[in-house]
Amino acid sequence: MITGVAICPPAPLLARELTGLDPVIPELRRACAVAAERLVRSSPEVIAVVGPGRRTAVWPADGRLNLAAFGPTLGTQSEPRGSPLPLPLGLGARLLDESGYTGPRLLQSVHSGEPAAACMRMGADLRTLSDRVGLLVMTDGSACRSLRAPGHLDPRAADFDAVLEGAVRGGDLGPLRVMDARLAGELLVAGRPAWQVLAGAMPGRALRTEIHYKDDPFGVFYLVAWLAGELGPVRRRARPGPAAARPARCRRSRQPGDVTVPNRPGVAVRRDRRWRSG
């Protein structure tokens, strides 16, 4: 089961080495620290960090943040231990370290081209890592919310981000499962696959949710949030008529405390709702 979910943006601004004295930055960092600390306090047996990357892969658990891409001198200021990680995973690993977490962790990057079905299957696999799994999702919204945004100003961005925020605030992540991948690409939503991994990991409704930060500095929508536990599957109204007999479902046996990385084959997901791109 999922004990809790922390959502933080994979923003370079979180790295102290890359920022100046902008007053927005400390507020964002504090919000991410609070969310990560709440995740650690949920007593997970393992924490999975998920974020966008150039390829879909599991990275070494001892990997650390590396800032060499931002300048040769910054590379020498990166974390001294472990293999270099993609920026989103490196920032997530640092958040866990600074929150005092020393338990098992899994670092999973997701390629931007992964289809929704594969992302949700990946999320479903993550929830089976252990009896108590924490999830740190490094993701963000559109990058088209102002004239100085990376994607300039797009009038569709505000509505897109409102759907993201509404799903998280309400604790029902169903809208994330049918996210319009094409629209997300046009709005430069780098975290689209990570959102859909989250949707696969949390098929039920969150027990409690709290938004710690919501803003769009520099034209990019950042959301920092905490989702606690699960109430169970969202119930759908049954169709009238006689109930058909169904075969019993088999479950894999697993020893308590096992932490494994299961295979992640793609599965078909019914798309009964769509985000509008126009």
Predicted regions and their residues:
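Actinobacteria-biased recognition of intrinsically disordered, low-complexity terminal regions
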Residues: 1-2, 228-278
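A short aromatic-anchored loop/beta-hairpin motif
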Residues: 1-87
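Cap/lid and interdomain-hinge subdomains that line or gate substrate/regulatory clefts
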Residues: 77-124
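Active-site beta-strand/loop microenvironment that shapes enzyme catalytic pockets
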Residues: 115-162
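Metal-dependent phosphoesterases centered on the DNase I-like endonuclease/exonuclease/phosphatase
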Residues: 151-179
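Polyanion-binding loop/helix "lid" in catalytic or ligand-binding cores
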Residues: 168-214
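Long, Lys/Arg- and hydrophobic-enriched amphipathic alpha-helices
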Residues: 200-241
